Regions:
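Structured mid-to-C-terminal alpha-helical surface segments
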Residues: 1-48, 57-66, 70-280
């Protein structure tokens, strides 16, 4: 067990060099893991379902994807400010001998660019005097097809895993595909494109095209975008040929070393490939 800030910083520094990853992001990831472990031991462990960037990073490795935030969906519980405050307060007080203290800073409704309503939780963790900010986005009612799965989440600095509920691969991809198709050239989130590419590269052989098809339809139905799916091929052409999207991709490549050698047409090729497998 990590007991001091010096010990933690040394481990983070070494991992940062090994993975060519930002040390600040790794510190946040460590603290998010501390929160996840508390979820896994809490009375809410069967209500929290991990999704988003932290799940993708766990699936592909920190050297291939980084994230600054934790995203989850909740089932069987109300998602409003009051109930989420009660839920979070219970989770952060789960006793674990890791020396990490959580302080709740704010809870508010998500209003920015959300495909679905939700709650944003801002916290700070304190460990041996080191303060790290955390942000958690929580939604409910997501279309998970066919259902959430038990996921063995490998810890970053320890040789063990924690069991949590998470999106299945097909639902992860379906949400990103739906966003790419419906937002077209207004989508500034290059991570959606990268995530589909890297997941196809590393997990394409385990992907079930029929489940992906059903997951995409269910996601579109939930978001009211079924008609837009009919223009998917045209959207892919428009997005790939767009100078604006190409410029955004170049900026993403410069910002994240794991994408630095990845050409835009190759990324779009992976997206087309997954889509073609799904509709055959």
């Amino acid at each position: 067990m990590i007991k001091t800030a010096r010990q933690l910083k040394d481990l983070i520094r070494n991992l940062s060099r090994e993975k060519s990853a930002d040390a600040q992001i790794l510190m946040r990831n460590y603290m998010m893991e501390r929160f996840l472990e508390r979820i896994s031991l809490s009375d809410y462990r069967d209500k929290f379902i991990l999704k988003g960037g932290m799940l993708v990073a766990a699936m592909v490795g920190l050297d291939a994807r980084s994230t600054m935030d934790l995203d989850a969906t909740i089932k069987g519980a109300n998602v409003n400010v009051e109930d989420i405050e009660t839920l979070i307060s219970a989770i952060v007080t789960v006793p674990i001998d890791d020396g990490v203290e959580f302080q709740l800073k704010s809870i508010s409704e998500i209003m920015d660019e959300a495909e679905y309503p939700g709650i944003r939780v801002s916290m700070a963790t304190i460990f041996d005097g080191v303060v790290t900010p955390l942000k958690i986005d929580i939604s409910t009612g997501d279309a998970i097809t066919p259902r959430e799965v038990r996921y063995s989440f490998k810890l970053m600095l320890e040789d063990r895993s924690i069991d949590i509920w998470a999106y299945n691969l097909e639902t992860v991809l379906a949400e990103k595909l739906e966003t790419i198709i419906t937002r077209a050239t207004t989508n500034t989130r290059m991570r959606d494109f990268y995530d589909i590419y890297i997941l196809e590269q590393l997990h394409g052989t385990t992907l079930n095209p029929e489940i992906l098809h059903d997951a995409l339809q269910a996601t579109a139905h939930k978001r009211g975008s079924e008609q837009k799916l009919l223009q998917a091929e045209e959207v892919f052409d428009e997005v790939e040929d767009s100078p604006v999207m190409q410029k955004l991709w170049e900026a993403y490549r410069k910002k994240f070393s794991y994408a630095s050698d990845l050409e835009w047409n190759v990324t779009m090729g992976a997206i087309r490939s997954i889509y073609q497998k799904m509709i055959q």
